[in-house]
Design a protein with these regions (language model features):
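Acidic, metal-coordinating helix/loop segments flanking the phosphotransfer/catalytic sites
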Residues: 37-54
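Two-component/phosphorelay signaling modules centered on CheY-like receiver
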Residues: 14-35
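Conserved acidic carboxylate
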Residues: 11
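Structural signature of beta-strand start/N-cap positions in the alpha/beta core
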Residues: 6, 33, 51-53
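Active-site residues of response regulator receiver
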Residues: 57-60
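Non-catalytic signal-transmission and effector/linker regions of two-component phosphorelay proteins
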Residues: 1-6, 16
């Protein structure tokens, strides 16, 4: 049985978001549902409507 995780990735670079997604989806024992966020404005909007289990954020997110 696998554990379901909702993870939000707040990162402006699509390449880095894609790399993180590839690594996270390979974790054994987890079903990963990702929310990709490219800007600080989208981050605030997303967090109002979604409650991720984990947030991975670039501290210099524009």
């Amino acid at each position: 049985m696998s554990t379901s995780l909702n993870i939000a990735i707040a990162e402006p670079s699509a390449i880095i978001r894609g790399g993180l997604e590839a690594v996270l989806k390979r974790l054994p024992g987890f079903r990963i549902q990702l929310i990709e966020i490219a800007t600080a404005e989208l981050l605030m909007e997303t967090l109002r409507s979604h409650k991720p289990d984990m947030l991975i954020i670039n501290p210099s997110l524009p």
